[in-house]
Amino acid sequence: MQKPLVCVTLRGRTVEEMCNDAPKAVKLGADIVEVRLDLLWTSVEKMTSSGTDEGGNESIEVIVNHLELDAIDVEDSITTISSSIEAPILITCRPQSQGGHYPGSEEDRVSVLEAAIASNPSWVDLEIDIESSKREDLVKLAGKGTRVIASLHSLEATPSISEITQDVMDAQDMGDMVKACYHTKGRKDALRIFESALKLKSSDANYSLMGLGPGGDWSRIHAPALGQGLVFATTESGWHLSQQGKINASDLRIAWEVLEYS
């Protein structure tokens, strides 16, 4: 059974933090590392609230602040990232409309993606809803040297199995890999994603399906059996990841060994 590629999304909100996380990601089993350029325009504040959690510990509230567009030197950041990280890189610059943090206009974001592609990354993430002519130009710019992930992210409820599979089939000619991520509110939502991936296994689509929320990690853990081509993981660890639908890269590799997906 062929195992999917493992892509680890780098932690950090500065170029230095992301570059420092890359070797750890590779050590944990990453085939590819994802650089979320949109996170460069954010900073985090951690504030202690008056309440406590279930374990009696002080509750910590995390506040994400957005920086001004001109706070980041895009060209310099991309140059440093591409020269400092040895692993294959997936470049992403997610708009706020799809759960990302890029603060500028869509025209500005496309310019960031153009600069990113010019650095010759192994992969680039291009959302399927980018204006068609602009997206075609980006795909042409990527050429044969940079593979394209055609992505879609739903912040609403998880759709039906037929809708999920149709999403993937409709997008399969828009890139080398289709990434579809859905917000899960419970196990039933996660099961629909799981069943959709299983249904797609008999197709010729190259896909990566996942959920963000309870049960979202099912399609990641069982990705080899579901015919998935790529799985996203993290260097972060902790029990909270399961509720977020995420999984640590090392834990993912161990799970595949235990389940004999090799």
Residue ranges and their predicted role:
Residues 11, 34-40, 65-70, 117-134, ...:
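Catalytic beta/alpha-barrel core
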Residues 32-80, 131:
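Glycine-rich, proline-tolerant flexible connector loops at the mouths of alpha/beta enzymes
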Residues 141-177:
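Histidine/lysine/aspartate-rich catalytic loop segments that bind and position anionic ligands
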Residues 2-6, 29-31, 85-89, 120-122, ...:
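Short, well-ordered coil/turn segments that N-cap beta-strands
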Residues 81-82, 89-126:
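Glycine/small-residue-rich loop that forms an oxyanion/phosphate-binding "nest" at active or ligand-binding sites
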Residues 2-19, 95-107, 151-162:
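Active-site mouth loops of central-metabolism enzymes
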